[in-house]
Swiss-Prot record:
The gene is cmk. One of its GO terms (molecular function) is ATP binding. It comes from Edwardsiella ictaluri (strain 93-146). The keyword ATP-binding applies. ATP binds at residues 12-20. The lineage of its organism: Bacteria, Pseudomonadati, Pseudomonadota, Gammaproteobacteria, Enterobacterales. It is an enzyme of class 2 (transferase). Belongs to the cytidylate kinase family. Type 1 subfamily. One of its GO terms (biological process) is nucleobase-containing small molecule interconversion. One of its GO terms (cellular component) is cytosol. InterPro entries: Cytidylate_kin (IPR003136), Cytidylate_kinase_dom (IPR011994), P-loop_NTPase (IPR027417). Keywords: ATP-binding, Cytoplasm, Kinase, Nucleotide-binding, Transferase. This is Cytidylate kinase.
């Protein structure tokens, strides 16, 4: 029964460091990992591949309901598999990210993917990375964390990440995109980006990733005792 399987939810905006934190928590505890944002990115990529109108809720719902996606963390790094193909890199572009955010604004699309996300809850436990994990997907999770950082810091991190991969990027453009996405995510009618009640709130703007991991892990272990 999934009701007794513990879940640690980690919510927050893009670029706050959720992915790194969740991988560290999963490794430290030996738990499964769900990158819910990747599911929406996979849906966006699938829509682009199959030429489905990303602004049509009616067209996206059946695609979401039959989305063939799985996560493979056997080799350490989280691999995202869509229809048998490793799309871990392909889903991380800004275009796919912005498309995913638009798709996530549709209530019926979110409902179609909700059951699939909950199916990742298996023993011994699950680390759930997303934007509404603690408020909507796993409201009964015993440990909830909200990780944030300033838009400027997140844009800087994203710029360094993309430059490291050989992309030519502009800081001001990235900052504008992040602020636009933040506004959309925080103000949407369904499942807006807000800290869950009782969540540990961490601001990583001036914290090292090691400090963030240490605080989150200490909180989780204390709560789960």
């Amino acid at each position: 029964m999934t009701a007794i399987v513990p879940v640690i939810t980690v919510d927050g905006p893009s670029g706050a460091g959720k992915g790194t934190l969740c991988k560290a928590l999963a490794q430290a505890l030996g738990w499964h990992l769900l990158d819910s944002g990747a599911i929406y990115r996979v849906l966006a990529l699938a829509a682009l591949h199959h030429q489905v109108n990303i602004d049509s809720e009616e067209a996206l719902v059946p695609l979401a309901a039959h989305l063939d996606v799985r996560f493979d963390a056997a080799e350490g790094d989280l691999r995202v598999i869509l229809e048998g193909e490793d799309v871990s890199t392909a889903i991380r572009t800004e275009t796919v990210g912005n498309t995913a955010s638009r798709a996530a604004a549709f209530p019926r699309v979110r409902e179609a993917l909700l059951r699939r996300q909950r199916a990742f809850r298996e023993a011994p436990g699950l680390i759930a990375d997303g934007r509404d994990m603690g408020t909507v997907v796993f409201p009964d999770a015993p440990v909830k964390i909200f990780l944030d950082a300033s838009a400027e810091e997140r844009a800087h991190r994203r710029m360094l990440q993309l430059q490291g991969k050989g992309f030519d990027v502009n800081f001001e453009s990235l900052l504008a995109e992040i602020k636009e996405r933040d506004f959309r995510d925080r103000n949407r009618a369904v499942a807006p980006l807000v800290p869950a009640v009782g969540a540990l709130q961490l601001d990583s703007t001036s914290l090292s990733i090691e400090q963030v991991i240490a605080q989150a892990l200490a909180h989780a272990r204390q709560t789960l005792v």
